[in-house]
Amino acid sequence: PHAASLKNIFTEAYLHGHNLAHATRILLNSLFQDYGLVIVDGNDTQFKANCATIMQDELFNQSSEKIVNEVLATFPYEAQAKPRNVNLFYLQRNLRERIIYHSDKDIFEINNTSITFSPEQLKKEILLHPENFSPNVILRPLFQQKVLPSLAYIGGGGEIAYCLQLKSLFQYHHIQFHMLLLRDSFLLVDEAAQKKLNKLEI
């Protein structure tokens, strides 16, 4: 009974939205308009500016790689994500590429482009255009917790392990580390598997 209205909502969102993020906001606001949903644009300049100190440390100290690799050296679980020497992307229109630091030349290169920055140029870029930088999987939780602090994170086993390998990084940046709660899960056992379990007395 709602097919026509849903089609109109999707059409309005994805044909008239300025970009994918804007279209998704239109869609979610339409679907949850009666529930007071708050939508945050992770690429907002002010939000990114709040994380400028993390970006600067990442670019000029490469702390994430050192800290996370120290944790992984004695980590009791399989590594969920491995750090690079710079865990940031550089963004421009139709461009999202890794930032690579070349210590021998002391320059930063934007992967798959001819764009390079000196340290001073990159410091200025962060100051003037923090929205041009985006965290990868290692830094994203820190950005999120700094901008929108949460008390607890509920996740599966792999997700909890992922958070645990970043705990020291949170402490280094003086960002409160949320409580971790393992979500309920279940395993569906079919008849054949159940027979084997019974036979093995498991």
Question: In which residue ranges do the predicted regions lie?
Answer:
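N-terminal targeting/trafficking signals and adjacent low-complexity tails
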Residues: 1-202
